[in-house]
């Protein structure tokens, strides 16, 4: 139960941080390009890299990994987890899985969003 609470609290902090940062970036850089999402995804990738790097170097306890990586970064952006998992695939020499995961996630993700939007336009 403690692990669940740690992920929950970390997720709340990550989500709140994403919201505040997105507001700031959108106000600072208005326009059609999604600067806030782009920035959040890149910052999240940097954070999860730092967290997992420090976790390995200093044998960080599992509850800290859950709070910081799964909770905080997961609430901030799931793109960071996607990027980290792909790095692991590359490091393990699993190039086929890396390619399938990268291309598949992008293609199916975009397709799923498109289908979701289209489903909202169907008259019942």
Curated annotation (Swiss-Prot):
Keywords: Cell inner membrane, Cell membrane, Ion channel, Ion transport, Membrane, Metal-binding, Sodium, Transmembrane, Transmembrane helix, Transport. InterPro entries: FluC (IPR003691). Na(+) is not transported, but it plays an essential structural role and its presence is essential for fluoride channel function. It catalyses: fluoride(in) = fluoride(out). GO terms for molecular function: fluoride channel activity; metal ion binding. Na(+) binds at residues 74, 77. One of its GO terms (cellular component) is plasma membrane. The chain crosses the membrane at residues 1-21, 35-55, 70-90, 98-118. One of its GO terms (biological process) is cellular detoxification of fluoride. It is a multi-pass membrane protein. Its main location: membrane. The keyword Transmembrane helix applies. It comes from the Bacteria. It is found in: Cell inner membrane. PANTHER family: FLUORIDE EXPORT PROTEIN 1-RELATED. HAMAP family: FluC (MF_00454). Fluoride-specific ion channel. Important for reducing fluoride concentration in the cell, thus reducing its toxicity. Belongs to the fluoride channel Fluc/FEX (TC 1.A.43) family. This is Fluoride-specific ion channel FluC. The lineage of its organism: Bacteria, Pseudomonadati, Bacteroidota, Cytophagia, Cytophagales. The gene is fluC.
């Amino acid at each position: 139960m403690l692990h669940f609470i740690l992920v929950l609290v970390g997720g709340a902090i990550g989500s709140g941080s994403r919201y505040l940062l997105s507001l700031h970036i959108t106000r600072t850089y208005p326009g059609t390009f999604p600067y806030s999402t782009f920035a959040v995804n890149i910052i999240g990738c940097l954070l999860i890299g730092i967290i997992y790097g420090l976790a390995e170097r200093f044998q960080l306890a599992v509850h800290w990994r859950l709070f910081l990586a799964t909770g905080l970064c997961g609430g901030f952006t799931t793109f960071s987890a996607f990027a980290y998992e792909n790095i692991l695939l590359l490091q393990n020499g699993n190039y086929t899985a890396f390619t399938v995961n990268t291309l598949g996630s992008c293609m199916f993700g975009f397709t799923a969003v498109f289908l979701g939007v289209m489903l909202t336009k169907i008259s019942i």
